[in-house]
Amino acid sequence: MNPVPATCIRIERLSKTFRGQSTPALQAIDLAVAEGEFVALVGASGCGKSTLLRLIAGLEAPSEGQVCLDGRPVQGPGCDRAVVFQDYSLYPWLNVLENVRFCRSLRAHTRDASESEVNSAVERAYALLELMGLDEVRTRYPNQLSGGMRQRVAIARALMAQPRVLLMDEPFGALDAQTREVMHELILRLFEIERSTIVFVTHDVEEAVYLADRVVVLAPQPGRIDSIHPVALPPPGARHPDLKLAPEFLRQKKTVLDRIRATSGVQRDLDKLSRLAELSRRDRRPDAKPATGTH
């Protein structure tokens, strides 16, 4: 019997209301994320996915409740958490290697790191560049790279500090479909090697089910957890693109998508359109009686 993983992130009664807003962006969120777990957050626009990620990162302060990492309340950003955003956030004046090493180099300068620590950081940087397929472009600058390559640099930089938690906010949303699929395989390989705990925000249900151990559906206005879906598929490290065609994968994708539609009002709108289409078909029948008004 495998031991139960320890809880890495615990979110308790977490709420966030932004200044000038009457409706909370998030309300009464309770969630536990296990050590080494990959959790995806999905939901309609405005459900608070990115806000929840920023609260875990310590980039926003909660209005109520708390986020705990290893039992300690999150008070702000920390080296135990790294964030990858959709817009890459690379330093344009630094080349690939310098971008990857930046945060680790800054820490070394501020606390007078030993020679062995510096050497270890250099070795890790080169290892990450090789793992991410960046070793041949390490002297190039961000404006000389494709979107997919820039996101690889951002992920490598996030992993340099060996964070306990990797937070990813729509990291592949701006990439074309082919590049996104390549990045899926890359992130699964990294997850298997690094074993970081990952919280991943996406609007793509197929992406969420393919990558994650669990998918959390958030409902909007106010943002709250609607449902949590364990992914009953091979573990993330053993998944392959062909899995997306498997009946069980398609069933789980539909289950999550149905919940998003239900919470966002999309299904209600689709039902109205179906009713309108039926009325239109009926009115076009030869034997249909014209509608009459009351005077």
Named regions from a protein language model:
Residues 101, 105-108, 113-137, 189:
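Conserved ABC ATPase "signature" region
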Residues 84, 155:
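Hydrophobic anchor residue at the start of the ABC signature
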Residues 2-8, 16-28:
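A short, flexible loop at the N-terminus of ABC-type nucleotide-binding domains that lies
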Residues 42-44:
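The feature captures the beta-strand-to-loop junction immediately N-terminal to the Walker
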Residues 141-145, 149:
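Conserved ABC ATPase signature
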Residues 57:
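Helix-to-loop junction immediately C-terminal to a conserved catalytic motif
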Residues 160-164:
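A short, proline-enriched helix->beta-strand linker immediately N-terminal to the Walker B motif
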Residues 65-77:
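Conserved ABC transporter NBD signature motif
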